[in-house]
Curated annotation (Swiss-Prot):
Keywords: Cell membrane, Membrane, Transmembrane, Transmembrane helix. Residues 1-25, 100-114, 182-195 are cytoplasmic. Belongs to the Casparian strip membrane proteins (CASP) family. Homodimer and heterodimers. It comes from Oryza sativa subsp. indica (Rice). This is CASP-like protein 1B2. It is a multi-pass membrane protein. It is found in: Cell membrane. The chain crosses the membrane at residues 26-46, 79-99, 115-135, 161-181. It holds the Pfam family CASP_dom.
Amino acid sequence: MDLEKGKKPSEQAAACRIMQVKDKLITLQPVVRACVFLATAVAAVIMGLNKQSYTTVVAIVGTRPVTQTFTAKFKDTPAFVFFVIANAIASGYNLMVLVTRRILQRRAQSLSVHLLDMVILTLLATGSATAASMAQLGKNGNLHARWNPICDKFGSFCNHGGIALVSSFIGVALMLALNLLSAAANSPRSNVTGQ
């Protein structure tokens, strides 16, 4: 019957396989989005609660030591504040899309979600990169600017920041994968007949 219509049976099978692959890509998106939500939420919470105090002796008056307490908080560095905000926005956005995904099934709405996914990916990547540069500065210092490293005194602060950074970069990688899945699922149906 296909030969009467001018189609080859292999073309119809290829079109069916393409639709099956697209269906698998569409069903995989909520799983990846949930993983992005978890990774970015963990990063935002860990960095948002990151605080450590360090007490040291600054002078000795007679026989009595004078101490001073230094505190490292994420709020002290604008890059870490941006990191927390970017991860919070990304986790909130992904949660919102997960909750409303049944409503967003039409192609036009799916394309707007794809465009917003790219914006969130950019926001998340820049937040992670700025925090990583400040974390590197805190760990190694900058000898040319005479900025000493602080991770030898604030070890817990640096460890928690590192965990938050790893979680955020996992979120960036998953968000990139989600963008690729979304682009493949939203691509127009290919012309199998070659016309």
